[in-house]
Structure formats: C-alpha cells, structure tokens
C-alpha cells in the first residue's frame, strides 16, 4: 500500500480529501484519509477545481518557478463528475447536491456559523440544508481521525470547530 511504501522509504504520504468531502463524511478512514498531511483539508471542492484551472492557465516559464512547464491537471480530471469510486458508475451528486450548491451551504454552516433558518432565508432549500447540517454533525468522528493540514479559512476542522461524537448531539 501507499502507506507501507511511505514508511519504507521515509516519505510522508499526502491525503487528497478536501473540506467539502470531509464536511459530509465522503472520506474513507484507512483509505483516502490515510496519510500524514492533508494539503486540501481546508479547501472546498469548488476551490480545488478553481486552483487546478488557475494552475493550468498560469504555467511557469523556465527559471520562473517550481513545477513542470505545462498544465499539470488533465482537463478530464477537472471535468469528470466527482465520485468516491466505491462502486461502478457512482457519482457524488447521486446523494449530494452539486458542489456549486453544497459548498456555499457548507461555508454558511462552518465558516459563518449560520443556522438552517438563516441559510433558508438566503434562498437555499430547507430540506437540503437540514440534510447537509446532519451530515456535518455525523461526520465529526471521521474528521477527528484525519491528518493535520493547511488552514485556509476562518474556521477549520479541529481547533476551530469541534462537536461531540457520542451523545447524538444536535443543535437546538
């Protein structure tokens, strides 16, 4: 496995999870969460796609910067529908709203600490927001087991935002 190779050669394994996936529990303990550092831990999925497009459009020239001279993220990876790839033809939007809808809801719940009612007042569907809020609370146990990572936003998971994992906690 990658972790075994990491240990054998003394390298740190990086994880690929982002804030959107970690928020709603779309991460596998001892799977894509296994590693020593999470570069994308505090970046929402739409931000990750934006960063990929930006990097592909801003290619360093020889002697100007680090990295290969040319696009580094294939367009097919950016445009492919997101999936945990745990079963054939699975797509994240089979069970979640599109990330263009999910990420603003998560931003409101996590960064701004808004209630379901406040997000509904902003025009989001009540059932969708309530379901996302529930997923956010239920996935707390997974986030506690994730590797450390970069902090980009005002409220990252860990020190900035922790909720109980054992007592069926829900906000009132």
Show the residue positions of the predicted features.
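ATP/NTP-dependent adenylation/nucleotidyl-transfer catalytic domains that generate, transfer
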Residues: 1-172
């Amino acid at each position: 496995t990658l972790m075994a190779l990491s240990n054998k050669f003394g390298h740190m394994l990086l994880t690929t999870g982002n804030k959107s996936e970690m928020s709603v529990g779309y991460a596998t303990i001892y799977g894509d969460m296994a590693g020593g550092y999470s570069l994308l831990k505090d970046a929402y999925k739409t931000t990750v796609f934006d960063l990929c497009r930006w990097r592909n459009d801003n290619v360093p020239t020889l002697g100007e910067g680090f990295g290969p001279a040319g696009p580094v993220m294939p367009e097919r990876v950016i445009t492919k529908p997101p999936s945990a790839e745990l079963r054939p033809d699975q797509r994240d939007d089979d069970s979640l709203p599109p990330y263009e809808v999910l990420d603003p809801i998560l931003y409101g719940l996590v960064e701004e600490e808004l209630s379901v009612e406040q997000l509904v007042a902003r025009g989001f569907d009540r059932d969708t927001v309530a379901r996302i809020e529930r997923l956010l609370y239920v996935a707390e146990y997974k986030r506690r087991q994730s590797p450390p990572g970069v902090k980009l936003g005002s409220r990252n998971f860990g020190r900035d935002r922790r909720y109980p994992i054992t007592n069926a906690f829900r906000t009132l």
